[in-house]
């Protein structure tokens, strides 16, 4: 009798376990239906090319809690510091005229000036960014966060925007009075003496 009762208990327990497993499948389905993957932060990207059309890197923009994260990667450049800015027009034409000055032509001049240059002097343009350091191996990597513009500011206006790597370092208009008693001149306040335009990418 005891053995029969034990077998009955085992069979009953097994039935309950199997019933529980069958119900578990439904629960999993409910979890799958109600769980949603978090949406990716809005972002944009620019592929950097030199005047010959060769790709030299990229710059990505994404929204983060503190503002806009900017991540720049370059390769194949000479070691040293390079000026890095967002320009006001989304055109990267290798031989073009500057907006409003058709008599002046050069590499990527169609990208216009720095984003926000009409509202402030360098280094307080909205498009001004920290300098990009390229190592002895010819590669450079920069991550920074700015609250001067959002991703939509770069792509939502009619003429877009572009990222520019300049041929030299940006002094951010930091010219001590012992060198220039009158302070930085107009050219320095415009570009930080970063030199010509080396590579450009339209923000998309």
Model-inferred region functions:
Residues 2-5, 11-14, 22-81, 86-204:
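N-terminal leader/targeting pre-sequences
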């Amino acid at each position: 009798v005891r053995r029969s009762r034990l077998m009955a208990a085992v069979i009953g327990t097994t039935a309950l376990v199997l019933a529980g497993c069958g119900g578990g499948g439904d629960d999993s389905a409910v979890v799958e239906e109600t769980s949603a993957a978090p949406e990716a932060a809005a972002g944009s990207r620019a592929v950097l090319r030199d005047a010959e059309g060769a790709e030299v890197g990229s710059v990505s923009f994404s929204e983060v809690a503190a503002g806009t994260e900017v991540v720049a990667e370059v390769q194949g450049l000479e070691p040293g510091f390079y000026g890095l800015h967002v320009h006001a027009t989304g055109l990267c034409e290798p031989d073009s005229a500057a907006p409003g000055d058709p008599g002046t032509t050069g590499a990527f001049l169609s990208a216009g000036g720095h984003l926000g240059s009409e509202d402030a002097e360098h280094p307080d343009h909205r498009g001004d960014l920290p300098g990009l350091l390229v190592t002895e191996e010819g590669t450079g990597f920069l991550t920074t966060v700015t609250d001067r513009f959002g991703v939509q500011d770069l792509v939502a206006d009619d003429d877009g925007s572009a990222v520019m790597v300049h041929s030299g370092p940006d002094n951010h208009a930091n010219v001590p009075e012992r060198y220039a008693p009158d302070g930085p001149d107009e050219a320095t306040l415009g570009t930080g003496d970063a030199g010509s335009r080396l590579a450009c990418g339209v923000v998309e």
